[in-house]
Amino acid sequence: MEGFGSDFSVGGSSAGKVDTGAIMEQVKVQIAVANAQELLQRMTDKCFRKCIGKPGGSLDNSEQKCIAMCMDRYMDAWNTVSRAYNSRLQRERAKM
């Protein structure tokens, strides 16, 4: 009689083996989605607080312009920081 959980043993059939590559890809996708959601949430919070003085049923023209400009600046800043961070990571990895 085989032991409990023998489908995941090192030897034997590949039917029960875990595909770690596929799992890693799924985790990477989930992390990317979570990061994008967090970026969007932070940007929305900051721009709302900056641009909306008195919340109402709709945005006036100046509020719309303020939000658009705020979001553009936020994304530009995030992209600049992201590029600098990735560049630094690459330099650090090259030193290893």
From Swiss-Prot:
The keyword Cell division does not apply. It comes from the Eukaryota. One of its GO terms (biological process) is protein transport. Belongs to the small Tim family. The twin CX3C motif contains 4 conserved Cys residues that form 2 disulfide bonds in the mitochondrial intermembrane space. However, during the transit of timm13-A from cytoplasm into mitochondrion, the Cys residues probably coordinate zinc, thereby preventing folding and allowing its transfer across mitochondrial outer membrane. Mitochondrial intermembrane chaperone that participates in the import and insertion of some multi-pass transmembrane proteins into the mitochondrial inner membrane. Also required for the transfer of beta-barrel precursors from the TOM complex to the sorting and assembly machinery (SAM complex) of the outer membrane. Acts as a chaperone-like protein that protects the hydrophobic precursors from aggregation and guide them through the mitochondrial intermembrane space. GO terms for molecular function: metal ion binding. It comes from Xenopus laevis (African clawed frog). Heterohexamer; composed of 3 copies of TIMM8 (TIMM8A or TIMM8B) and 3 copies of TIMM13, named soluble 70 kDa complex. Associates with the TIM22 complex, whose core is composed of TIMM22. A motif (Twin CX3C motif) lies at residues 47-70. It is found in: Mitochondrion inner membrane. This is Mitochondrial import inner membrane translocase subunit Tim13-A. The gene is timm13-a.
